Amino acid sequence: MPVQSRWVCSACGQTAAAVGPGGGSTPPRCRNPWCSSADRPLAAIFAVGTYEGAFRRAIVSYKYRRDLRWAPVFGRLLHGFLERHETWFEEFAVICPVPSFIGQGARRPWGHTELVCAEVGRLAGAEWPVESLVTKVAETEPMSAKARPARRAIARTGLAKAFTVPQPAAAEGRHILIVDDVCASGWTLLTVSRALRDAGAEEVAALVLARGVLGANRPSGSP
């Protein structure tokens, strides 16, 4: 009888099932197409948890209802993850929040990720300093509840032009850990990491509070 075993992608952390005699010895290709992309600018994505249940409700309350009580909680969660897995992040010299657009026409006139990272920086001190190396210069169309082709179109037009690195010298040669709240499709993280790599960063990885589960179904229009 075939034995089913589970594999974990070293790039995105998603699990995949391998079916074969004894479970097989060769890991299957990750379902996320970005993980096998030769020009992927993002080394890996680390996540504290998955975007479901009570954790998802807390993130939605913070991000969409501006329940600011969650900011220090999320900051402590991220810092605790960094401390528990310190050896994973020892090469990274700086934490960079994925920025929000807060100018005219912004969906949210406040930086939700920046606020969480401020708490991380307060707790981490000089070990993992927080620097805003990337700026978002324009609002972008939301990608939640969009099909993959629509997300790809948004990413290749508005998203790619929205993020800039004002001072490339600040990124040059550095190992940078970008931080965001949720990784769903990964397009935002990939776009920000590509901007940093184009500015001269040696390596970019990402840490998020929660990652979406590939294949998970959510009601249309849900965040």
What are these regions (language model features)?
Residues 1-223:
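Glycine-rich phosphate/pyrophosphate-handling loop used in enzymes and phosphotransfer proteins
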